[in-house]
Amino acid sequence: MVNPTTSEVQPTMGVKIFSAGVSACLADIITFPLDTAKVRLQIQGEGQASSTIRYKGVLGTITTLAKTEGLPKLYSGLPAGIQRQISFASLRIGLYDSVQEYFSSGRETPASLGNKISAGLMTGGVAVFIGQPTEVVKVRMQAQSHLHGIKPRYTGTYNAYRVIATTESLSTLWKGTTPNLMRNVIINCTELVTYDLMKGALVNNKILADDVPCHLLSALVAGFCTTLLASPVDVVKTRFINSLPGQYPSVPSCAMSMYTKEGPTAFFKGFVASFLRLGSWNVIMFVCFEQLKKELMKSRQTVDCTT
């Protein structure tokens, strides 16, 4: 992600992974209500999720959830979300530069677009497989409603892991890996590569210095591009993960059912919520990530100088 100047020390792989994990967790805590609103909007209109309550827009969904199910509902599934970022974002973001450098080893020129995309594909794919159980639990906790006397499927995050593994199967914790892999390959490549290219263009053309305003603008552009490309796969992933056993035989059948029953616009349900969430998440995560890397390396230099 644009190498630091010669006067700066390159962050180590450990610093990048730690910084990515901490920054992603902070971003998740702040933006989680938007993510919950996105999930509710995405499953709206689905058979098992239908109810007398209709969600209208992002703020309307958040307000309705707070009024009908209580403010804590906006953070239902947060522990799984934090676990997801620790196991997922720390790897896909923290390893991106190192994998990119590996693909570019032996070359004096900067990493090509192909190398950047390859790095995004590899880190995103590995992270999805490791973090998929946390994604399944997070989505199900966000989707379940406590209204109309409906008994919730899960009483908490760890109860959800246990119930899913014992009543469905252990493999169900990896349910939806295919659409989630597709989604996160798109997200990882688009998000990291767009951020990398945008930041590089701003810094190399001396439009902005490699500082907070540059990181903020690059993150916003990356967030919009990512949401636009990933939204259809994201909706299918959410529907499939949240589905009851046997409701959809496969991922394609889930997508086809959405198309025939709700039309093509169903694939962009919750788009505004997705952008608000991903855009703000990107800004918080990337700005914190860049600053934390710098501060950790400064601290390390200070320690090295005193020893």
Curated annotation (Swiss-Prot):
Disruption phenotype: Mice lacking Ucp1 display an absence of adaptive thermogenesis in response to cold. Compared to wild-type mice, they are sensitive to cold and consume less oxygen upon treatment with beta-3-adrenergic-receptor agonists that normally activate thermogenesis. They also display impaired adaptive thermogenesis in response to diet variation. If they display lipid accumulation in adipocytes of brown adipose tissues, no overt obesity is observed when mice are housed under classical conditions, i.e. 18 to 20 degrees Celsius. However, when mice are housed at thermoneutrality, i.e. It comes from the Eukaryota. Pfam families: Mito_carr. Solcar repeats lie at residues 11-102, 111-201, 210-295. Changing residue 25 to A: No effect on UCP1 activity in thermogenic respiration. InterPro entries: Mit_carrier, Mito_Metabolite_Transporter, Mitochondrial_sb/sol_carrier, Mt_carrier_dom_sf. Keywords: Ion channel, Ion transport, Membrane, Mitochondrion, Mitochondrion inner membrane, Oxidation, Repeat, Selenium, Selenocysteine, Transmembrane, Transmembrane helix, Transport. It catalyses: H(+)(in) = H(+)(out). It is a multi-pass membrane protein. The keyword Membrane applies. Residues 1-10, 97-116, 196-212, 290-307 are mitochondrial intermembrane. Induction: Up-regulated in response to cold in brown adipose tissue where it may regulate non-shivering thermogenesis (at protein level). Up-regulated by high-fat diet (at protein level). The chain crosses the membrane at residues 11-32, 74-96, 117-133, 179-195, 213-232, 267-289. GO terms for molecular function: cardiolipin binding; GDP binding; GTP binding; long-chain fatty acid binding; oxidative phosphorylation uncoupler activity; proton transmembrane transporter activity; purine ribonucleotide binding. Residues 33-73, 134-178, 233-266 are mitochondrial matrix. Expressed in brown adipose tissue. The modification Cysteine sulfenic acid (-SOH) is found at residue 254. Sulfenylation at Cys-254 is increased upon cold exposure. It increases the sensitivity of UCP1 thermogenic function to the activation by noradrenaline probably through structural effects. Changing residue 214 to A: No effect on UCP1 activity in thermogenic respiration. Fatty acid 16:0 binds at residues 56, 269. PROSITE patterns: SOLCAR. The keyword Ion transport applies. One of its GO terms (cellular component) is mitochondrial inner membrane. Belongs to the mitochondrial carrier (TC 2.A.29) family. Mitochondrial transporter that functions as a long-chain fatty acid/LCFA and proton symporter, simultaneously transporting one LCFA and one proton through the inner mitochondrial membrane. However, LCFAs remaining associated with the transporter via their hydrophobic tails, it results in an apparent transport of protons activated by LCFAs. Thereby, dissipates the mitochondrial proton gradient and converts the energy of substrate oxydation into heat instead of ATP. This is Mitochondrial brown fat uncoupling protein 1.
